UniProtKB/Swiss-Prot annotation:
Subunit structure: Forms a heterodimer with MUS81.
Protein EC: 3.1.22.-
Coiled-coil residue windows: 203-253
The keyword Cell membrane appears for this protein: no
Domain ERCC4: residue ranges: 287-484
Protein's recorded name: Crossover junction endonuclease EME1B
Gene: EME1B
Pfam families attached to this UniProt entry: EME1-MUS81_C, ERCC4
Length: 551
């Protein structure tokens, strides 16, 4: 719907203009620029054929339209707010209607300069296109009225009024909404040094929060991966440690340091091949003691910090051929070499290995018998006897050929590697020959794991089921000896202490341990003489009446 503005000098100034429609408009209402510098035109009769000037609302993006008018300055100023509410009208009025003044020219120039500048918030291209089509000369604006025809469209209505018609049929935004919109638009623009708008702040806060969340998740993922890797590394090290403690890495960790002169003889090639077959690491070089072999253990790098002091193998092997050994014995240098080895390695066990010694001696004796010469048999037996009687941790070994020598050295290397991780023997440890546990015994696995059960089974005539009965009542030797050492009990009470223990029968039911077995266990454990036989102990040998502190 189009709104018309009727402008006439003859109308009453108090007559209100038609009100604008309250319906929302699509395009903003154009402003009207009114200049009353020209004299007021005379009102024409209705029947006169006067062509009015139509000033349409600007169809482009500018909000200003310019209309020449001659409203009085005072009347226009007083009724501007009432008559033109809803329209934006700029009046170029002057006190003198006939002659232009410098103030009016300056005022017009400032207004036109404002018209040339594009309105804030609109596109520059639309504003430039508009000013190209509605160019208004700046000179002599108060005298020349032809500029109004350049910005207007001609039409042929019969009215004598100046109508302002909008080219848009529907406008959805009112002037109040436009003003409000412009206010919001100007306030929402970012100004340097001021806080950002709430919407933009909230958007940026969301973005930063999401980025922080992503970084936190990434950091947590990396921490989990690092902890997982550390846990896997810890488990791997623990596994390697257990392997090392059980001796599974012993053969790979031992290194045989062989003197170069050992490999110069006939046993060199065969010995190297045997080491290669077993996968044992060797190091060939000059040793402090000639013709010697020593061993060292290298701990894997992963578990080396767990064992600051690696295992030490206190063993040294001297390898001699038969002829060389006989010459050393004949010259009296062999015992000197043994003394020098003990001085250098005081805690080491020394072994002297000879190859084909006895066959070489017999061969030379036969030759000497057939062709007598200067050769005499060296005192081999006396020297070997002295090794046993005069030296500690020194012994000898004789091999019949090179194969046996190589086999002995390789086997000795394997044994030295594994013995470092074997359980140490204790006072209650029983050798395999002394453990009288039948193969079909139900509790043989339990007995093998307990030194106390092994010690009980080692006592003659003490069956495994008897030992289990004692073990259930007294789970350790200390608990039983504590009762045996009690001064308040007599020897008779101590001897028959175990007679009433229940023993599981072979065919079911429980039987008593008995007086004989109880007395045997007591006398064997409390005997002061370890050299007597068990039968003598049972019969009363080494009785305890004379022992101090025993009732």
């Amino acid at each position: 719907m189009n709104d018309h503005i009727l402008i006439s000098d003859g109308e009453d100034q108090t007559t209100p203009l038609p009100s604008l429609s309250k319906r929302a408009r699509k395009y903003p209402i154009s402003a009207i620029l009114i200049s009353d510098s020209d004299p007021t035109p005379q009102k024409q009769p209705p029947e006169s054929s006067f062509t009015p000037i139509f000033v349409p609302e600007t169809p482009l993006s500018d909000d200003f339209s310019v209309v020449k008018c001659s409203f009085g300055s005072r009347a226009l100023a007083s009724n501007r707010e009432d008559k033109f509410s809803g329209k934006r009208i700029i009046s170029l009025d002057s006190e003198f209607e006939d002659s232009p003044r410098p103030e009016t020219s300056k005022k017009n120039e400032s207004v036109l300069a404002g018209l040339r500048e594009p309105r804030f918030g609109l596109e520059a291209e639309t504003s430039e296109a508009y000013y190209k089509n509605t160019r208004i000369p700046e000179t002599n604006l108060d005298d020349d009225t032809s500029w109004m025809h350049e910005v207007s469209f001609r039409s042929s209505p019969t009215n004598d009024t100046i109508e302002v018609v909008s080219d848009q049929e529907k406008e959805d935004i009112s002037v109040e909404k436009i003003g409000r919109k412009k206010k919001i638009r100007t306030t929402t623009l970012p100004v340097p040094g001021e806080a950002l708008p709430k919407k933009r702040q909230s958007k940026e806060d969301k973005t930063s929060a999401m980025e922080e969340k992503k970084l936190r998740k990434e950091q947590e993922r990396l921490e989990k991966a690092a902890s997982k890797a550390e846990e896997a590394e810890r488990k791997r090290l623990e596994k390697e440690k257990k392997k090392w403690e059980k001796g599974k890495l012993a053969l790979k960790s031992i290194v045989a340091e062989i003197d170069t002169k050992v490999l110069e003889g006939s046993i060199g090639g065969l010995l190297l091949s045997r080491f290669s077959e077993k996968g044992i690491t060797i190091h060939v070089g000059p040793n402090p003691i000639e013709r010697s072999i020593v061993w060292t253990m290298t701990i894997p790098e992963d578990i080396a910090p767990l064992f600051p002091q690696g295992p030490k193998i206190p063993y040294l092997l001297l390898v001699y051929d038969a002829e060389e050994f006989c010459n050393l014995v004949a010259n009296g240098k062999f015992l000197e070499i043994i003394s020098r080895v003990q001085d250098r390695y005081p805690s080491y066990t020394v072994c002297c290995l000879t190859n084909k010694l006895m066959s070489y001696v017999k061969k030379r004796e036969k030759e000497e018998y057939k062709n007598p010469g200067n050769w005499r048999r060296p005192p081999i037996d006396e020297v070997l006897a002295k090794l046993t009687t005069h030296y500690v941790k020194v012994h000898s070994r004789h091999c019949v050929d090179e194969a046996e020598v190589a086999e002995h050295i390789v086997g000795l290397t394997s044994s030295l590697a594994s013995c470092q991780f074997r359980k140490k023997l204790t006072m209650l440890s029983v050798s395999a020959n002394g453990a009288l546990v039948s193969k079909d015994s139900v509790d043989k696995h339990l007995i093998k794991k307990s030194p106390w059960l092994k010690a009980l089974v080692a006592i003659p005539k003490v069956q495994p089921r008897y030992a289990l009965a004692v073990w259930k009542k007294y789970p350790s030797m200390k608990s039983l000896l504590k009762v045996y050492m009690d001064r308040n009990k007599s020897v008779h009470e101590k001897e028959f202490l175990l007679k009433d223990l229940k023993v599981e029968g072979l065919v079911g039911g429980d039987i008593r341990l008995g007086e004989i077995c109880s007395k045997r266990i007591y006398r064997v454990l409390m005997s002061h003489d370890g050299a007597i036989k068990t039968d003598d102990v049972e019969n009363g040998a080494a009785f305890f009446t004379d022992s101090p502190g025993v009732n």
